[in-house]
Amino acid sequence: MEILCEDNTSLSSIPNSLMQVDGDSGLYRNDFNSRDANSSDASNWTIDGENRTNLSFEGYLPPTCLSILHLQEKNWSALLTAVVIILTIAGNILVIMAVSLEKKLQNATNYFLMSLAIADMLLGFLVMPVSMLTILYGYRWPLPSKLCAVWIYLDVLFSTASIMHLCAISLDRYVAIQNPIHHSRFNSRTKAFLKIIAVWTISVGVSMPIPVFGLQDDSKVFKQGSCLLADDNFVLIGSFVAFFIPLTIMVITYFLTIKSLQKEATLCVSDLSTRAKLASFSFLPQSSLSSEKLFQRSIHREPGSYTGRRTMQSISNEQKACKVLGIVFFLFVVMWCPFFITNIMAVICKESCNEHVIGALLNVFVWIGYLSSAVNPLVYTLFNKTYRSAFSRYIQCQYKENRKPLQLILVNTIPALAYKSSQLQAGQNKDSKEDAEPTDNDCSMVTLGKQQSEETCTDNINTVNEKVSCV
């Protein structure tokens, strides 16, 4: 079977020659003139360890054919990475729309999640496609060399922003549990946006040295024709500052938050049981108390019980939110830890470790880390009803929640029913007043209150002039 290349020329009809792949530029060139080569010549692969790879075999393979064969071998990898890119961009756009349009989701934690979705979406737009392109070109940089430092800068920026957002969310939840009054007072939308700006500022500061030094010295961002960080000091410092230190803070504050929630729930349950015992305790039987005292006691009892129910509800909501955030934290740590651990191992055991194995692991682990940006919207969909309903409506191009017809029927019918019942009751009262005759027992028939009975008795005494005691 012949492979046809450019200009419809088959491999068997082209003479042999010796091709050289330049390791610095990634370009192909001929070392021999095709006129001097015999069609029966054949030679073998020879590899120069530093800069070039000499390629020759039976049947001359021009550069375009080599590229086509190389791309065909990478089709499956490109397909998988393309699926990850599409899921990342589409899912995070849905998260941004949900927080922007749904009033139920407009709080401090969801603002952080929206900013996190923006970072993940930009990672899918600007970083992942270029990384997929390097896979197709055998992990060699196919773009101008000046763009390498910019691409690494964006990669580090958005990855650092993701871990910083999760760290800030963990700290914010812990402060909200420990000091809810202070947190609710200073947790306005403006304060939340200021915190988000601080997170992005820290992320920019951590990643800014890459373009500053990389644009001046290509050796810091190029290694054997591949675009990657070649400065060991920056790899070590950047890994700890951008990942391990925020990770430690995030894990500690998250477990402290869970512990505080359990303590609050225990105290709330004990407080509710104490209130119930005090409310049911009385020296006198309930039948011996007047209706006025019973009414006052019930009024004093209800606010406390309502407050207890509201506290339990808020604790339950916090526990559900911490569960969702805990899943997000766990997935982020599991997916990014292999890359950063391997990255540090590549620096520490540079001489003892196999460089090719470490490089292959890093190429796989970085895409596992990218996958965490696509997983977050799926977590929100599975564990949050508001996100789930919003996503389903947005996919159907319905950007506003439709009100249920039952609610409209209730609003329209209840006032009419209330009006009819009030008119009927008024008519019955009027008929009863017309049929009633004044007797001596008019004073004893009044049961609506002491003041009203006294006024009715006074009117009857003035009109009838009977000697009836109304006390």
Swiss-Prot record:
For this chain the motif DRY motif maps to: 172-174
Q: What Pfam families does the entry give?
A: 7tm_1
TM ranges: 81-97, 112-137, 147-171, 192-215, 233-258, 323-348, 357-382
Q: Which CDD domains match?
A: 7tmA_5-HT2A (cd15304)
Which is one Gene Ontology cellular component term of this protein?
A: cytoplasmic vesicle
Task: List ligand-binding residues for serotonin.
Answer: 155, 343
Described purpose of this protein according to its UniProt entry: G-protein coupled receptor for 5-hydroxytryptamine (serotonin). Also functions as a receptor for various drugs and psychoactive substances, including mescaline, psilocybin, 1-(2,5-dimethoxy-4-iodophenyl)-2-aminopropane (DOI) and lysergic acid diethylamide (LSD). Ligand binding causes a conformation change that triggers signaling via guanine nucleotide-binding proteins (G proteins) and modulates the activity of downstream effectors.
The name this protein goes by in its record = 5-hydroxytryptamine receptor 2A
